[in-house]
Amino acid sequence: MRVADFTFELPDSLIARHPLAERRGSRLLTLDGPTGALAHRQFTDLLEHLRPGDLMVFNNTRVIPARLFGQKASGGKLEILVERVLDSHRVLAHVRSSKSPKPGSKILIDGGGEAEMLARHDTLFELGFAEEVLPLLDRVGHMPLPPYIDRPDEGADRERYQTVYAQRLGAVAAPTAGLHFDQPLLEAIAAKGVETAFVTLHVGAGTFQPVRVERIEDHHMHHEWLEVGQDVVDAVAACRARGGRVVAVGTTSVRSLESAARDGVLKPFSGDTDIFIYPGRPFHVVDALVTNFHLPESTLLMLVSAFAGYPETMAAYRAAVENGYRFFSYGDAMFITRNPAPTAPKDLAPEETV
């Protein structure tokens, strides 16, 4: 399967660089999996597509202000993007500078603070901080807006690039499908008889990395930490018993649930995942999906294509562009029910469709 099969033309004007005034103000493109039918709605119309007895699964990770600016002791400027907090004083980070810092070198953080380069692990740098990392990031860190939001972060991003139900610190990118939900909408969902459950997947900066191979099968996913608790397993079982659907809010919730059910049975799981879902891969847990619009040739677009079917997904994206939907993290959303017989690009080998 070719990565190029997942490209589409996107006018720059459709990239959402700022959030709307209200979280729930986005548009919603619905895609019916069994028929491929599309409908243009508002995000608050999501309520009409949910049924009593359904279970919505959210990712409760919390974005940390993971971007730091500073300079080396030699005076050279650099930028740090924390990828993972290892403990109270150490992180793994991407470092951008004219020359990479060497082990033992000191880094002075803008706004106050100091770090030491401890070791290099492939493309990541292990950094040690004199003070505790999370309070330091909260004090002088910047929200790690995605590269396609090509502007400096603003004070408002600390609130809006965060879900209202975010709890567990550790993400360096938001689970963006959740950004559309405000507290009144969550209350309305509960009032309809829809249950909720929460997984945790700390989204890493690797989510924005382009696929650099020509064929999908040659791509290796980055690792991210996740946790699916026994409470989620029990909630899914109860949902199945009452005939409800499991509705994942965001691709990170999908990847969490499907990682915990790789052998076909959902079990509690805590640890790293590198699951790569693309056309031909089965889904064991998720029946419906709320998701934003994703980048061309991205692994997230491939996941949606696996869920809804390749031709149906690409047709939906063409319709979204034609109708002026806003794309990416601060953009509009889709509600998709799973296609029971999804098809893939034409050159998918038969053995890969099972």
From Swiss-Prot:
GO terms for biological process: queuosine biosynthetic process; tRNA wobble guanine modification. One of its GO terms (cellular component) is cytoplasm. GO terms for molecular function: S-adenosylmethionine:tRNA ribosyltransferase-isomerase activity. It is found in: Cytoplasm. Its EC number is 2.4.99.17. It comes from the Bacteria. Keywords: Cytoplasm, Queuosine biosynthesis, S-adenosyl-L-methionine, Transferase. It catalyses: 7-aminomethyl-7-carbaguanosine(34) in tRNA + S-adenosyl-L-methionine = epoxyqueuosine(34) in tRNA + adenine + L-methionine + 2 H(+). Pathway: tRNA modification; tRNA-queuosine biosynthesis. Monomer. Belongs to the QueA family. Transfers and isomerizes the ribose moiety from AdoMet to the 7-aminomethyl group of 7-deazaguanine (preQ1-tRNA) to give epoxyqueuosine (oQ-tRNA). This is S-adenosylmethionine:tRNA ribosyltransferase-isomerase. It comes from Pseudomonas fluorescens (strain ATCC BAA-477 / NRRL B-23932 / Pf-5).
